Regions:
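Alpha-helical scaffold elements within enzyme catalytic domains, especially in hydrolases
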Residues: 5, 21-25, 84, 145, ...
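Glycine-rich phosphate-binding active-site loops on the catalytic face of alpha/beta enzymes
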Residues: 9, 54-62, 94-107, 143, ...
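Histidine- and aromatic-rich ligand-binding microenvironments
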Residues: 30-32, 40, 49, 57-59
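Single conserved hydrophobic/aromatic residue that forms the stacking wall/gate
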Residues: 1-8, 12-13
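Alpha-helix-loop-beta-strand connector modules within alpha/beta enzyme cores
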Residues: 17-35, 54, 62-77, 109-133, ...
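Conserved PRPP/pyrophosphate-binding segment of the phosphoribosyltransferase/PRPP-pathway fold
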Residues: 22, 36, 82, 95, ...
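Catalytic cores of alpha/beta
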Residues: 35-48, 77-89, 128, 132-134, ...
Length: 177
């Protein structure tokens, strides 16, 4: 299912045993391969980057380990989280959750549409221009309203991987953007 959803997408993976195989497949498809949390794995297999959660290694430390040329993203739930990631020179921010999701345990407070509007407005006011990716419980029908808030990207792993045809679900979502 993961391979069927690769076309035209970025993929964030947490499963170490299949990382090398997925990296090769991502290269074939021209997809970006970001590993969740595992900085040493990113370095070892030369993945495109790492996504760091709120309790993970600081961005600056990951940058020291990886060096330049790797994407380093971080998780945020508040404007204070975003300010910190901006100071640490993150390349992008995964911000959420939008709503309850089954793909992540121990969720931070839900943001909803108004939360994203407020965060995007505050980022603009403060001159923080990091790409902001909405994440957490997002379904196909949420995409237009979320994009209207000013977020730069939307993570939709559940909506894609649980679809009868992940490839078609991804294609439909790409066509909406």
């Amino acid at each position: 299912e993961m391979q069927r959803s690769l076309v035209g997408s970025e993929m964030c993976i947490r499963d170490r045993p299949i990382a090398r195989r997925l990296l090769a497949r991502c290269r074939e498809e021209g997809a970006v391969f970001v590993v969740d949390d595992r900085v040493e794995l990113v370095k070892a297999i030369e993945a495109d980057g790492v996504h760091l959660g709120r309790g993970d290694m600081p961005v600056a430390e990951a940058r020291r380990v990886l060096g330049e040329g790797f994407i380093i993203g971080g998780t945020a739930n508040t404007i204070d989280d975003i300010r910190r990631l901006h100071r640490e020179s993150a390349d992008y921010i995964g911000c959420g959750p939008f709503r309850y999701t089954e793909t992540k345990a121990n969720l931070a407070p839900l943001l909803g549409i108004e939360g994203y509007r407020a965060i995007v407005a505050q980022m603009y006011q403060e001159g923080i221009s990091l790409p902001l990716c909405a994440i957490g419980g997002i379904q196909r029908e949420d995409v237009p309203e979320l994009l209207a808030t000013g977020v730069n990207a939307i993570a939709v792993s559940g909506a894609v991987l649980k679809a009868p045809s992940p490839r078609q679900a991804m294609a439909d979502l790409i066509n909406m953007a």
